[in-house]
From Swiss-Prot:
Substrate binds at K141, D173, T211, R212, Y213, E214. Its EC number is 2.1.1.33. Keywords: Methyltransferase, S-adenosyl-L-methionine, Transferase, tRNA processing. It comes from Agrobacterium fabrum (strain C58 / ATCC 33970). Catalyzes the formation of N(7)-methylguanine at position 46 (m7G46) in tRNA. HAMAP family: tRNA_methyltr_TrmB. The active site is at D137. Pfam families: Methyltransf_4 (PF02390). This is tRNA (guanine-N(7)-)-methyltransferase. The lineage of its organism: Bacteria, Pseudomonadati, Pseudomonadota, Alphaproteobacteria, Hyphomicrobiales. It comes from the Bacteria. SUPFAM superfamilies: S-adenosyl-L-methionine-dependent methyltransferases. S-adenosyl-L-methionine binds at E63, E88, D115, D137. It catalyses: guanosine(46) in tRNA + S-adenosyl-L-methionine = N(7)-methylguanosine(46) in tRNA + S-adenosyl-L-homocysteine.
Length: 232
């Protein structure tokens, strides 16, 4: 398991939050750009999260553990009328996304660089249209499964912040985590799995850009599952 994936855990984040030394330009984005984009949990959250964005956005999408930010940036460019909130505690990954935000002048992204559960508890009820949890740390050893981000308590958080009819998308190349997520969502009762055939969960999401973890899984001979749930 990589240190980056280890940093993206469940109720708290385990492992180090910084890897290789940052280059000067990356340090600049962390010190000067991140404070402009970071959500301040000490402030009172707006009832309508579109107020967080200078861009004219109409819906809100949350990605937890965005890694290098390839998917988040792709979706932000693809959907300029959607406001994106990205959560990633790993400093090097945050620096990569910030470089893209600066280069592409993306105005529809806001960020949080700590425990995602803190942000989820801050968000107003029914304020999010879509949540992405893509290739989260699988914690493959059974004794560590309780550390997985998908849990009863975190699904309750998702259900609280998602609007009725909102989407929760989960992708993983680890079969036990896919089954774990299906079982937890079924037990919760507030999430409807949309699949009607195997092709529905074997086929990547529309306009899917791929991720580094997906590519690694393919090289190692593992296929991925792409689950979509609707918040009841």
């Amino acid at each position: 398991m990589t240190e980056e994936r280890r940093s993206r855990a469940t109720e708290a984040f385990f492992g180090r939050r910084k890897g290789k030394p940052l280059r000067n330009q990356q340090v600049d984005t962390i010190e000067n750009l991140l404070p402009l984009l970071k959500i301040d949990l000490e402030s009172v959250p707006p009832q309508n999260l579109v107020a967080l964005f200078p861009a004219d956005v109409r819906s809100i999408r949350l990605e937890i553990g965005f890694g290098g930010g390839e998917h988040l940036a792709h979706r932000a460019v693809e959907n300029p009328e959607t406001g994106f909130i990205g959560v990633e505690p790993f400093v090097n990954s945050m620096a990569k996304l910030l470089a893209t935000v600066r280069e592409r002048e993306l105005m529809n992204i806001r960020l949080y660089d700590d425990d995602a559960t803190q942000l989820l508890d801050w968000l107003p009820e029914g304020s999010i249209d879509h949540i992405d949890l893509l290739y989260p740390d699988p914690w493959p050893k059974k004794k560590h499964w309780k550390r997985r981000f998908v849990s009863d308590v975190n699904l309750a958080r998702f259900h609280r912040v998602l609007k009725p009819g909102g989407k929760f998308c989960f992708a993983s190349d680890i079969d036990t985590y896919v089954n774990w997520t299906l079982q937890h969502c079924a037990r919760h009762g507030g999430f409807e799995w949309t699949a009607t055939s195997a092709d529905d969960w074997r086929t990547p999401y529309a306009n899917w850009p791929g991720t580094r973890y997906e590519n690694k899984a393919k090289r190692e001979g593992r296929s991925s599952a792409y689950l979509t749930f609707i918040r009841r």
